[in-house]
């Protein structure tokens, strides 16, 4: 993936987000969980460990690998260019806000179990969660970069 193009990174991120949705419709997302205590009952079995790491753990590979691909894309951007930084900031804030607003609307339109598909909760990490989370993360990173470039000699601790 180090040599992947920006388009391939974004395609991979989007693909992983929707692959997770397909997995949720195919397999039991709650298998192995005691949701009343948020403990994973069969974690120390081979099947439970694989399921937890790949699919239904706190930070499963699918779809969390999408965040890595998006981070790789961000790392390739010319963040020294103030216009690029500001464009990335405003797009990321807009994307996060739109994802959250869309989620609120769709969850109200489709209440109950079907509304979970449109949620932005971390468990299960549905596509709108990935979009909102990535937008928020990029915005925070960009704000930190902006402060760093604006105040290069500032220190947090004396």
Ranges and model annotations:
Residues 1-158:
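Alpha-helical transmembrane segments and their immediate juxtamembrane cytosolic regions
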């Amino acid at each position: 993936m180090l040599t992947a193009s920006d388009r391939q990174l974004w395609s991979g991120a989007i693909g992983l987000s929707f692959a997770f949705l397909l997995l949720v419709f195919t397999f039991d997302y709650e298998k192995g969980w005691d949701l009343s205590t948020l403990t994973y009952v069969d974690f120390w079995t081979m099947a439970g460990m694989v399921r937890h790491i790949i699919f239904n753990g706190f930070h499963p590979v699918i779809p969390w690998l999408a965040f890595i691909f998006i981070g790789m894309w961000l790392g390739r951007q010319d963040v020294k260019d103030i216009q690029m930084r500001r464009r990335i900031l405003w797009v990321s804030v807009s994307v996060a806000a739109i994802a959250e607003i869309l989620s609120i609307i769709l969850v109200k339109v489709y209440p109950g179990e079907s509304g979970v598909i449109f949620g932005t909760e971390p468990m299960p990490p549905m596509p709108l969660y990935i979009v909102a989370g990535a937008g928020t993360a990029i915005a925070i990173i960009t704000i930190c970069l902006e402060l760093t470039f604006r105040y290069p000699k500032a220190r947090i601790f004396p």
